[in-house]
Amino acid sequence: MSTNICSFKDRCVSILCCKFCKQVLSSRGMKAVLLADTEIDLFSTDIPPTNAVDFTGRCYFTKICKCKLKDIACLKCGNIVGYHVIVPCSSCLLSCNNRHFWMFHSQAVYDINRLDSTGVNVLLRGNLPEIEESTDEDVLNISAEECIR
């Protein structure tokens, strides 16, 4: 597997908001495609969203691969906004992937490009710290203007 093909460092980082209630769900989102069906657009994140989503329903498996999934719903409005890959299958782990296991449906969330510390340039994945210093409250208290923008 070539490093160039699987590099995600030049991808834009996004703030992900629920389309139903405008709740901020993640500040580390990235556009993604479903490995099992590249026609399906998604957003993903590497860190579990805290105080924004929770699991709902039972675990299930896809027809295309053997990943074990569980839906996630927005805590503010209750709508299903995506799913978590509870147990990735070996086929998906061996393919080119970004190691994000929190997935958001493009029909349920919208994205806002996140800016770097200068406030001018779009923040790129390669410049995003693995674990951010901000508290959960900092992430979730993004202004309504920022979410509506």
Curated annotation (Swiss-Prot):
What GO cellular component entries does it have? cytosol; intracellular membrane-bounded organelle
Induction pattern: Up-regulated in gastric cancer.
Report the protein name in the record.
Protein FAM72D
Please provide an example of a Pfam family that matches this protein in its UniProt record. YPEH2ZP
Instruction: Give the family this protein belongs to, as stated in its UniProt record.
Output: Belongs to the FAM72 family.
UniProt source species:
Homo sapiens (Human)
